[in-house]
């Protein structure tokens, strides 16, 4: 992101990273997890609700993107880099069996950047987390993006290192109240 080191460095080429992102978007679309802020496609957001299952067949576009854009050696290197960071917030919450809303993708096309669409997109996820009474979580690989998420109300939950320069920042936004389930139990 703007010259910052990040997970893009784990990919052998920018085209492999682009293929991965396209595969992820196709998977999100097939699972009904892709949302937009408006008619013009000002911002796109992919999030997974607690308990939402990923259909097996929908993983094929992502797998095809990975295997089609990298050699076996490059795939092994990519897997090695990705495993260095250790368990993130998502894995910790899974282990503790705590529900959460996971934001896997947030994209604001260049013509719409700096116009508040990132906030609008995130507010969709925050509102859904609020409605369900669960935290919204995401991870990002650039310090400047992390700072934007912090400005939008998220909290830094942890940092993972991938090699000498690359990091992943785990962020969380807790709901203001316990949601529908919390209200029923009172």
PLM region spans:
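Helix-loop element at the rim of GNAT/NAT acetyltransferase active sites that forms part
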Residues: 1-15
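Conserved beta-hairpin
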Residues: 30-48
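Conserved GNAT acetyl-CoA-binding A-motif
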Residues: 100-101, 128-141
């Amino acid at each position: 992101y703007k010259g910052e080191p990040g997970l893009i460095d784990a990919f052998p080429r920018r085209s492999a990273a682009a293929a991965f992102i396209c595969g992820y978007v196709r998977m999100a679309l097939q699972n009904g997890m892709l949302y937009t802020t408006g008619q013009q496609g000002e911002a796109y957001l992919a999030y997974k609700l607690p308990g939402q299952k990923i259909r097996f067949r929908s993983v094929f576009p992502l797998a095809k993107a990975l295997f089609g854009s990298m050699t076996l050696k490059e795939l092994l290197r990519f897997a090695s880099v990705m495993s260095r960071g250790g368990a993130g917030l998502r894995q910790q919450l899974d282990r503790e069996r705590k529900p959460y809303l996971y934001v896997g993708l947030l994209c604001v096309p260049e013509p719409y950047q700096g116009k508040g669409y990132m906030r609008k997109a995130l507010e969709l996820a925050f509102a859904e987390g609020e409605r369900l009474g669960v935290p919204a979580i995401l991870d990002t690989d650039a310090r400047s993006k992390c700072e934007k998420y912090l400005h939008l109300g998220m909290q830094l939950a942890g940092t993972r290192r991938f090699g000498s320069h690359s990091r992943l920042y785990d962020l969380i936004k807790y709901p203001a109240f316990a949601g529908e389930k919390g209200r029923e139990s009172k």
